[in-house]
Curated annotation (Swiss-Prot):
This is Large ribosomal subunit protein bL20. PANTHER family: 39S RIBOSOMAL PROTEIN L20. Signal peptide: none annotated. The gene is rplT. InterPro entries: Ribosomal_bL20 (IPR005813), RIBOSOMAL_L20_CS (IPR049946), Ribosomal_protein_bL20_C (IPR035566). It comes from the Bacteria. It comes from Stutzerimonas stutzeri (strain A1501) (Pseudomonas stutzeri).
Amino acid sequence: MARVKRGVVARRRHKKILKLAKGYYGARSRVFRVAKQAVIKAGQYAYRDRRQRKRQFRALWIARINAGARVNGLSYSRLIAGLKKAAIEIDRKVLADLAVNEKAAFAAIVEKAKASLA
């Protein structure tokens, strides 16, 4: 059986890693051994941050809703309690968008929440 030399396979593997590391600084984009570590680490960061993004957006939405609610004389927690009592099911993403872009509509929702709390 003929001996298989690994040149083609190794070259392909190196090119793949170096392509993924394109745009990295210095040796991280040029040296295979360093680039491989950088690509692995980047993948770990990407995996972690896909999960963190969901938490960060929820926190941002809550901060925006809280700011809008306080302008209308209610705290975030009281607003959410009022919405639950009034059986208004609007998610935080939409509420935050209303608080920022549609202040009148948000104020109307806050008033309904206030009425259900009274």
